[in-house]
Amino acid sequence: MKHLSKAAQYTLQFINQTNKSVFLTGKAGTGKTTLLKEIIATSHKNTVVVAPTGIAALNAGGVTIHSMFQLPFAAFIPDYKVVNSNSYQYKFETKSTISKHFRMNGTKKQVLVNLELLIIDE
């Protein structure tokens, strides 16, 4: 284990020994990336790392949120009565149209079924 602060060591232990959510934040240079890499390297949990953009995903050693969960590049409008996506120049997804995007292959389904730790990096 790299040299981690007591707080970082506690966080790492907490992540590995519980199923609780953790929100890690801090200013630049406080060790967030170091802790993230240590979590990835040492966790016994089935882990997936995602990020909102391609560059962030590459830097974190993961994939984009959209590609992991096969999300469309469109705004989601939960109340389908509010908008008709064909009448706008921008693409919208509704409850009735978004389901067509969730056809995952067997491998990706198994990854999600077995997922124990999801790391979302900015």
Where are these regions (language model features)?
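Conserved ATP-binding/catalytic motifs of P-loop helicase motor domains
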Residues: M1-E122
